[in-house]
Amino acid sequence: MMKFLKQVGDYTKEAIQAGKYIGQGLSVTFDHMRRRPITVQYPYEKLILSERFRGRIHFEFDKCIACEVCVRVCPINLPVVDWEFNKETKKKKLNHYSIDFGVCIFCGNCVEYCPTNCLSMTEEYELSTYDRHELNYDNVALGRLPYKVTNDPMVTPLREFAYLPKGAIDPHDLPAGSRRAGLRPEEIVEQSQQ
């Protein structure tokens, strides 16, 4: 009889322990059920990108002086600049400019070092095609004005990180009552006015 009671007691302890483990696992599940969804319903919802987003390159043909700085600073020598020397004006005349976005790494060096600012990064990132040769943009395709996500009536623009659960990106701030190193811009202005 004692052996039977001991077995029942052991079984009860194991059942309680198993219930604890199941409860711990389900607590994680229920915790995630209370959070907001993390995914974005992509074709119908798009994130508003930051100003410094490096998307498709926009090219202004009239500003380009065919100096080929963009080719020299590109890590893979990607932009193709075709020009001819005009003997009358003694200047280069740009004939053709192209960038293959299938190869481009979107580093932004060409935009940064361009002396005439004829290149700029846009917020376009939807460059998918069925044929990789369609990713080779010539000066006409590069000159096409970029679109903005916020101007598309079929898309719900979402603020950056607004879709994340609350507390997911809370700043790691200083303890209450302590000061940051240095001065804030407002404090510098106040000091200069005094």
Curated annotation (Swiss-Prot):
Any Pfam family hit: Fer4_7
Compartments (UniProt record): Cellular thylakoid membrane
Residues binding [4Fe-4S] cluster 1, per UniProt: C64, C67, C70, C114
Molecular function GO labels: 4 iron, 4 sulfur cluster binding; iron ion binding; NADH dehydrogenase (ubiquinone) activity; quinone binding
Domain 4Fe-4S ferredoxin-type: 55-84, 95-124
Keyword field: 4Fe-4S, Iron, Iron-sulfur, Membrane, Metal-binding, NAD, NADP, Plastoquinone, Quinone, Repeat, Thylakoid, Translocase
Chain intervals for the UniProt region annotation (Disordered): 173-194
Cofactor note: Binds 2 [4Fe-4S] clusters per subunit.
GO cellular component, one term: plasma membrane-derived thylakoid membrane
Protein residues bound to [4Fe-4S] cluster 2: C74, C104, C107, C110
Superkingdom as given in the UniProt entry: Bacteria
Reported cofactor(s): [4Fe-4S] cluster
GO BP term (any one): photosynthesis, light reaction
Topology in membrane: Peripheral membrane protein
S-S pairs: none
PROSITE patterns found in the cross-reference section: 4FE4S_FER_1, 4FE4S_FER_2
UniProt catalytic activity: a plastoquinone + NADH + (n+1) H(+)(in) = a plastoquinol + NAD(+) + n H(+)(out); a plastoquinone + NADPH + (n+1) H(+)(in) = a plastoquinol + NADP(+) + n H(+)(out)
EC number: 7.1.1.-
Protein's job: NDH-1 shuttles electrons from an unknown electron donor, via FMN and iron-sulfur (Fe-S) centers, to quinones in the respiratory and/or the photosynthetic chain. The immediate electron acceptor for the enzyme in this species is believed to be plastoquinone. Couples the redox reaction to proton translocation, and thus conserves the redox energy in a proton gradient.
Subunit architecture: NDH-1 is composed of at least 11 different subunits.
Protein family according to the UniProt entry: Belongs to the complex I 23 kDa subunit family.
Name the record gives this protein: NAD(P)H-quinone oxidoreductase subunit I
